Regions:
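Hydrophobic alpha-helical transmembrane segments
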Residues: 23, 34-42, 58-62, 89-94, ...
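Structural signal for the C-terminal ends of transmembrane alpha-helices
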Residues: 30-32, 74-82, 147-156
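Small-residue faces within membrane-embedded alpha-helices
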Residues: 29, 37, 41, 45, ...
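Hydrophobic transmembrane alpha-helices
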Residues: 1-31, 36
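Alpha-helical transmembrane segments and their cytosolic interface
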Residues: 122-168
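Juxtamembrane/transmembrane-helix interface segments of polytopic membrane transporters
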Residues: 4, 103, 107-115, 145-150
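Interfacial aromatic-anchored transmembrane helix boundaries in multi-pass membrane proteins
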Residues: 3-17, 42-77, 113-115
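Short helix-perturbing small/polar motifs within transmembrane alpha-helices
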Residues: 1-2, 40, 60-108
């Protein structure tokens, strides 16, 4: 959450490129699994409310604020059953793309009227481009998990399954 205050670029209608602020939530979702990742995503959403928000309707609020953070925590751990590079990268990629799709739909449906103000003839193209901040924001996350020492750390981290078995 603290990393989300390190904004490298802030967009005019919300959203920003940060210093890998998604990484802790993605990592927790990967380590703890979808259930605990969902809970962490919801808590992360609540924390994000302290940074201010602007919304038009409850559906837009859900698509721009609630669902994107929940899917980051939930989907990052869906492939975590084995310690392979695909499981880590696949879960992270799925989570990031799902977050992007949430923002894209909200941008197209609710913010598309601003497309012409920014030189776009199409609300779809406008939303695709405007919300690409999510993909740019994900690049440092993928770079960091590609560093051999960090990749090795992820492989060694306990998964929730192993923790539950040890308690039994």
């Amino acid at each position: 959450y603290i990393l989300s205050f390190i904004k490298l670029y802030e967009l005019p209608f919300g959203g920003s490129i940060t210093a890998a602020s998604m990484l802790p939530l993605l990592a927790y979702g990967y380590m703890a699994g979808p259930l605990w990742g969902t809970i962490a995503g919801f808590v992360y959403f609540l924390l994000q409310l302290t940074q201010g928000l602007y919304f038009l309707t409850p559906l837009q609020f859900a698509l721009d604020y609630v669902v994107p953070f929940i899917v980051l925590g939930t989907l990052s751990g869906v492939f975590r059953t084995k310690n392979t590079a695909f499981n880590l990268y696949g879960g992270f990629a799925l989570a990031v793309v799902a977050r992007y799709l949430c923002h894209f739909v909200a941008g197209f449906v609710f913010w598309g009227e601003y497309a012409a103000d920014y030189g776009f003839n199409s609300p779809v193209l406008y939303s695709l481009v405007y919300n690409s901040f999510v993909l740019v924001d994900a690049i440092p996350c993928f770079i960091l998990i590609s560093i051999p020492a960090i990749k090795k750390l992820f492989r060694r981290l306990p998964k929730k399954q192993k923790i539950e078995n040890a308690e039994a």
